[in-house]
Amino acid sequence: MLKTVHQKAGRHTRPVRAWLKLLWQRIDEDNMTTLAGNLAYVSLLSLVPLIAVVFALFAAFPMFSDVSIQLRHFIFANFMPATGDVIQRYIEQFVANSNKMTAVGACGLIVTALLLMYAIDSALNTIWRSKRTRPKVYSFAVYWMILTLGPLLAGASLAISSYLLSLRWASDLNTVIDNVLRILPLLLSWISFWLLYSIVPTTRVPNRDALVGAFVAALLFEAGKKGFALYITMFPSYQLIYGVLAVIPILFVWVYWTWCIVLLGAEITVTLGEYRKLKQAAEQEEADQP
């Protein structure tokens, strides 16, 4: 009886072990942690230019003036670790200084922000091992669309949410709205990762695989955010070492950890499709044998 149970358990866990082995093999071959380090470096260089471009877009639309403040607080409260308020103050100072630049400097900011998107494109297509390339004009159009429409859509959604919350009939739904707002960061992360894994690769990505990989990445992102905040709160020894500069290594580590999660979700998405193809090929080979 016990032997039968072990045999059945082995049959059920064998595919999982094979898939995990394939996942680890791909992570090792793609040098995922090195790719994450490259993206973290480019992100830190592009962070202020990217935020400056986004805020400039909001400034161009007076209707979004109040929403931009809400969006700023929402991002730093839900997508940054416990020191988000400190990082927010520094970044806002940097952005305020960048607003004093000339037209040439502003163009440099835009180019730097677009370089981050190019780096993300290259890293994801390296993981998908896609040799296809988009026309440069098409790639630029996609990057610019993400850079402009993304913040505006986020601002519009926050404006609609604020309007609905201000309605009288919505006061009876406070409990429901509170519960929705709690899971909103997870949902936004899931949708963002899904769009990233579906649109950026130059090869076709099965929608189901992208949803699974994005969901795992979103869960890891939320868990990592909570764990990182707990570590900062419970073990403040880094403050004794770095003092007032403690926020710098925290930001570096958080950006690197975030890119590790993003690329791991991409590896999971790719591995799901590759494992399915290998399994189908093995079954076809067995069927062809006399």
UniProtKB/Swiss-Prot annotation:
Q: Transmembrane residues, as ranges?
A: 44-64, 104-124, 140-160, 183-203, 210-230, 244-264
Gene Ontology annotations for the cellular component aspect, listed alphabetically = plasma membrane
What's the chief localization of this chain?
membrane
Subcellular location, in the record's words? Cell inner membrane
> Which PANTHER family does this UniProt record tie to the protein?
INNER MEMBRANE PROTEIN YHJD, UPF0761 MEMBRANE PROTEIN YIHY
| Similarity comment text for this entry | Belongs to the UPF0761 family.
Q: What is this protein called?
A: UPF0761 membrane protein YihY
